[in-house]
């Protein structure tokens, strides 16, 4: 199996390591869309869909990611918070991504910061966004909520 993250763990491919423990490794992305954009990976290969993992594996990854996020908050000027997300479509190896939120201050106190983007996604476009869009219709939301509540997990 060819896996760039496995090669990084084995030292076959270099990385800009920022943190590690026995089970996880964190490094700066070589394709950052903001300063400090980082990836936290499991050293053991697991499939990239985070919510398909055993609870213990995912929990450990989240706790490792928290440590790295707090390092980013402390080390990057003007970063009060760091966002975390699981996407899993770039590389099929379990990982989280960390997005330092530059311009949010030097502490994690809440500040209301709203996006000016107003885009609704009908399909995945290769990235995740957390901005709000137009208010949805209550009848449509109620129908969707009912459908989700009635769904049984396999």
What do these predicted regions represent?
Residues 1-154:
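HIT superfamily nucleotide-processing domains
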């Amino acid at each position: 199996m060819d896996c760039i993250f496995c090669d990084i763990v084995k030292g076959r491919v270099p990385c800009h390591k920022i943190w590690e423990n026995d089970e996880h490794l964190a490094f700066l992305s070589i394709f950052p869309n903001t300063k400090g954009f980082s990836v936290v990976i499991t050293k053991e290969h697991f499939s990239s869909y985070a919510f398909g993992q055993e609870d213990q594996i995912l929990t450990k990854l989240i706790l490792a990611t928290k440590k790295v996020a707090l390092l980013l908050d402390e080390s990057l000027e003007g970063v009060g918070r760091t966002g975390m997300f699981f996407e899993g479509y770039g590389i099929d190896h379990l990982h989280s991504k960390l997005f330092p939120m530059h311009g949010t201050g030097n502490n994690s106190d809440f500040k209301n910061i709203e996006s000016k983007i107003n885009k609704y996604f009908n399909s995945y476009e290769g990235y995740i966004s957390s901005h709000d869009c137009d208010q949805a219709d209550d009848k449509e939301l109620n129908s969707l909520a009912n459908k989700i509540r009635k769904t049984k997990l396999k």
